[in-house]
Amino acid sequence: NEPTEWKLVFPKKFPFDKDVKNLTDKIEKYLKDSNAVLLKSSDDIYSVSDNFIVIHGFSSKESANSVLSVLKEHKNYKIKDQAYIISTEDYKIVQMKKKFEEWLLLNK
C-alpha cells in the first residue's frame, strides 16, 4: 500500500531555544513566499523532552525532498536543521507508539 501523503519532520528538544524560533520563522516565510496552500506547519508534541516541527501536506516523497532542498539551499532560508521525510501513515505510528528511534533505524 503506497503512502498518499508525506511530511517533513524536524525533531527538536523541548523546551525550545531561539534556533527553533528561527526554523519556524523560516518555514512560515517559505510557506508564505511559495504560496503553498496545501502545506501547513505545526509544532507536535512527541515526548516530555522532544517535539517535532512538521510541514504537512506533500503528495510525494519527491515534493517533500524538493522543498527541503529549497529550505537548505535558497539564500532566504539556509536552514541547517536535521529533517526527515516520513509518510503520514508512518508518522501516525511513530506518534502513537513513540517509535521514532526505531523508524530512523529502518529508514536510513
Predicted segments, located by residue:
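Acidic/polar low-complexity segments and flexible, solvent-exposed patches
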Residues: 1-108
